[in-house]
């Protein structure tokens, strides 16, 4: 007898092949049979008439490292069909790190990951994994190379000594041994922004020819995005490793329509020469990260205390104004998005809370300040722990990336403890189905499902996931594509998506018509499992 039988639905198996009618049988958390199973007995039967049956969706780029410990974790994810997520992205992982720079690291992670119980930030992934509560969905972890560097040398040093590299190498190897799925880079963030290309290659040398995925938030995603792709291809060639470029985009109207075709062409040529290169994209024209990210890399030298001193110094602020007006050598988000395109979504001091949800331009007008002075004063007041949403990308570029066979879908969901998160936390996967499939026809339903299942699974070597095939994990969604709906907005983002009839995690029903199961069937995914 089967544990579970899903009958009467249209199967979209994740491979991109045309949809077909079939039943699916589940036994022991695995897919046991696909076909006409009308004669089979099952302990539980699910009628999928009028619905499609797909693999569970996989988001390999979230920042839920600390959110996993929140009592309501999983609802936002399951409601949009997610059965697997991966954290530790952009070089920013909650582990591993020790005591020497713990306070600095926790402060730096705060706008991205939210409030962190120091007991959950551990020196080893082998300690972090057992500390996790029961999980409602499967969770994997990348080890953040930025966290490794900060643990070895803090945020103050721009150039490392051999002893620092030795510590980074040892910690990286240990994290991979403990089960990290790969390594993530955040070259747009301190302290990794201080690496030269050759220093970066040396820091990553334990990965050489090991077939371990490297994901990267590139050094620049605006006017320098093509050069940044070139840099990462240099790294991939030098180390002979699989490269996955995170949230590919071209920030700033001046770069729309030109930079992304060039970047995709570079990736396609690299793929043709034999490199294992892929990328991902989120389906929104706005991103979300630390407000600190508007500053040029050299302004970040010395760590947060040094940054605050510079922000308070009139001469340094004048120099910053000149850098932002010129926009040379860094992702000048203030210029690329405009002060009216940068919204404050995570503020924590009571006197600043009235500005929550306002743009920098709006706050500047309310306070009678110049926008840059307003921004700098807020950063000082909040000790740089501010989250923003910045509107800077082109929907046409997003469509170009989605059409590429190299791309998969991600959310880049951040989890600030207060304020208004980006609606992508709650709605990325329904947004793709609703907007880019149903409304705009950028992708077929089969193509979209592949970008949410098999392609992300392949990028991070999740061999038992991403498709409906006998022997693979029974992570399965049942839904009517016409009913899938993203309910959240930028003004009111914290709303669960609608339309998932069933979400099945490891053969266990986790969600049925908006009702969440009390069972926790999620597992911790480790490299090599």
Segments predicted by a language model, with ranges:
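N-terminal metal-binding scaffold of metallo-dependent hydrolase/deaminase domains
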Residues: 1-41, 462, 483-491
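C-terminal cap of metal-dependent C-N hydrolases
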Residues: 9, 313, 400-406, 411-412, ...
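Divalent metal-coordination and catalytic microenvironments
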Residues: 9, 24, 29, 50, ...
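Alpha-helical scaffold segments that flank or form the walls of functional sites
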Residues: 66-142, 161-178, 201-209
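Active-site neighborhoods of metal-dependent hydrolases
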Residues: 128-162, 168-189, 204, 237, ...
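Divalent metal-binding pocket/active-site signature
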Residues: 166, 174-234
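Short, well-structured alpha-helical segments that form the helix of a local strand-helix-strand
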Residues: 372-379, 445-453, 468, 472
């Amino acid at each position: 007898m089967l544990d579970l039988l899903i009958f009467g639905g249209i199967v979209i198996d994740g491979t991109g092949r045309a949809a077909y009618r079939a039943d699916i049988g589940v036994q022991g958390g695995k897919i046991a049979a696909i076909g006409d199973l009308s004669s089979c007995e099952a302990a539980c039967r699910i009628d999928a008439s009028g619905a499609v049956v797909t693999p569970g969706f996989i988001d390999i780029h979230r920042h839920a490292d600390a959110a996993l410990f929140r009592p309501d974790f999983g609802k936002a994810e399951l409601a949009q069909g997610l059965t697997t997520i991966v954290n530790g992205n952009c070089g920013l992982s909650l582990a591993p790190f020790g005591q020497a720079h713990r306070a600095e690291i926790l402060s730096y992670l705060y706008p991205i990951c939210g409030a962190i119980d120091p007991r959950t930030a551990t020196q080893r992934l082998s300690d972090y994994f057992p500390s996790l509560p029961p999980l409602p969905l499967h969770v994997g972890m990348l080890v953040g190379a930025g966290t490794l560097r900060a643990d070895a040398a803090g945020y103050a040093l721009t150039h490392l000594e051999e002893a620092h590299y030795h510590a980074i190498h040892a910690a990286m190897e240990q994290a991979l041994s403990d089960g990290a799925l790969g390594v993530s880079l955040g070259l747009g963030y301190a302290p990794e922004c201080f690496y030269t290309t050759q220093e970066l290659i040396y820091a990553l040398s334990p990965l050489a020819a090991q077939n371990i995925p490297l994901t990267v938030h590139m050094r620049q995603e605006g006017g320098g995005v093509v050069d940044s792709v070139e840099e990462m291809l240099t790294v991939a060639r030098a180390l002979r490793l699989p490269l996955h470029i995170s949230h590919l985009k071209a920030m700033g109207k001046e770069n729309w329509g030109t930079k992304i075709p060039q970047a995709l062409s570079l990736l396609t040529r690299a793929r043709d020469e034999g490199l294992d290169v892929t990328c991902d994209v989120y389906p929104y024209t706005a991103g979300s990260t630390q407000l600190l990210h508007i500053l040029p890399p050299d302004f970040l030298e010395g760590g947060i205390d040094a940054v605050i001193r510079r922000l308070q110094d009139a001469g340094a602020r004048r120099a910053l104004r000149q850098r932002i007006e010129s926009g040379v050598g860094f992702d000048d988000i203030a210029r690329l998005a405009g002060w009216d395109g940068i919204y404050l979504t995570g503020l924590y001091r009571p006197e600043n809370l009235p500005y929550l949800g306002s743009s920098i331009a709006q706050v500047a007008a309310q306070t009678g300040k110049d926008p840059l002075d307003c921004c700098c004063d807020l950063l000082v007041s909040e000790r740089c722990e501010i989250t923003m949403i910045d509107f800077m990308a082109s929907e046409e570029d997003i469509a170009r990336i989605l059409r590429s066979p190299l791309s998969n879908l991600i959310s880049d969901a951040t989890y600030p403890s207060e304020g208004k998160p980006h609606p992508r936390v709650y709605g990325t996967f329904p947004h793709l189905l609703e907007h880019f499939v149903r409304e705009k026809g950028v992708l077929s339903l089969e193509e979209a499902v592949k970008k949410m299942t098999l392609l992300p699974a392949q990028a991070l070597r999740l061999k038992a996931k991403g498709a409906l095939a006998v022997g693979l994990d029974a992570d399965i969604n049942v839904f009517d594509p016409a009913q899938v709906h993203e309910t959240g907005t930028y003004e009111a983002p914290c709303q669960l998506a609608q339309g998932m009839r069933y979400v099945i995690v490891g053969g266990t029903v986790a969600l049925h018509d908006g009702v969440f199961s009390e069972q926790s069937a999620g597992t911790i995914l480790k490299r090599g499992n």
